[in-house]
Each structure stands twice: as C-alpha cells, then as structure tokens.
Amino acid sequence: MFLGTFTPKLDDKGRLTLPAKFRDELAGGLMITKSQDHSLAIYPRDEFVKLARKAAAAPRNDPAARAYVRALAAGTDEQHADAQGRITLSADHRRYANLSKECVVTGSVDYLEIWDLAAWERYLGDNEEDYSQATGESLSEIV
C-alpha cells in the first residue's frame, strides 16, 4: 500500500529518487503516466496492466473511452528504478506536470502521485474544504 508524503528533489537529468519504503513494491517494474490535475501517477507494472486491460475493454465506438485509452497509452512510460531507487522522468512528463526541482511524491493507496511542490501546496489549500465535506455519491460507501 502506498501511503505518506515525501519531498525528493528532481536532479538536472530528470531523475527522481523514489521513497525507500516503496521500492520493494515497485521492484517488478513500474509505469509512469499522466494523471489528473497535472500530476503524474506511478503504478506497479502488474496493477497498471490490469487498469489498461480494463480500459481497453471499453466499447471502441465510445469517443470518451477511445480518448481515455489513447491518452493512457500515449502518456505512459515503463521503467525500472536504478540501484539508487531513481527513475528518469521524460521531458514530456516533466512538462505536463510542470515539475521544478522541488517535487512531492504522495501515496494514493494503490499508486503514487508526483507533483510539483508549489502545485501540491496550492491543491491542498484549494481542496481542504472538499476533503472536510467528502460525502458525495461516489464516496458514500466509505465515509
């Protein structure tokens, strides 16, 4: 399970060191993809394969499903962390997430998110009240 918030630095080569506590779960490979709110998502390879297969099973005559599958496939990079636990983020991924040297890696239960630190802090400030009032239909089973 991926829990917690960490603030690794992005180096000049676009490498980011993953938190040590997550490296075993990602040892079988990982998939980096564009996510909501101009963040990046890191999935263990096996979990991503399940997600991608589910997405690919959607009706191909549905324009929204087609667009989602296209964006998911085109925006994903498969990697293995190096011996120091670093991954290299592509220029496209760094641009999409507006990443500076100051980054945040945050757990999202079954995947990780990568944010620019300033964007993460803005997001937290903008959404604090939403979290306090999390009673929407999609959350009714858990809150």
Curated annotation (Swiss-Prot):
Compartment(s) where it occurs, according to its Swiss-Prot or TrEMBL record: Cytoplasm, Nucleoid
Gene Ontology process terms (BP): negative regulation of DNA-templated transcription initiation
UniProt keywords, alphabetically: Cytoplasm, DNA-binding, Repeat, Transcription, Transcription regulation
GO cellular component, one term: nucleoid
SUPFAM superfamilies in UniProt: AbrB/MazE/MraZ-like
Residue ranges occupied by any SpoVT-AbrB domain in the UniProt entry: 5-47, 76-119
Molecular function (Gene Ontology), one example: transcription cis-regulatory region binding
Database matches in CDD domains: MraZ_C, MraZ_N
HAMAP family in the cross-refs: MraZ
Subunit annotation: Forms oligomers.
Family to which this protein belongs: Belongs to the MraZ family.
Protein name: Transcriptional regulator MraZ
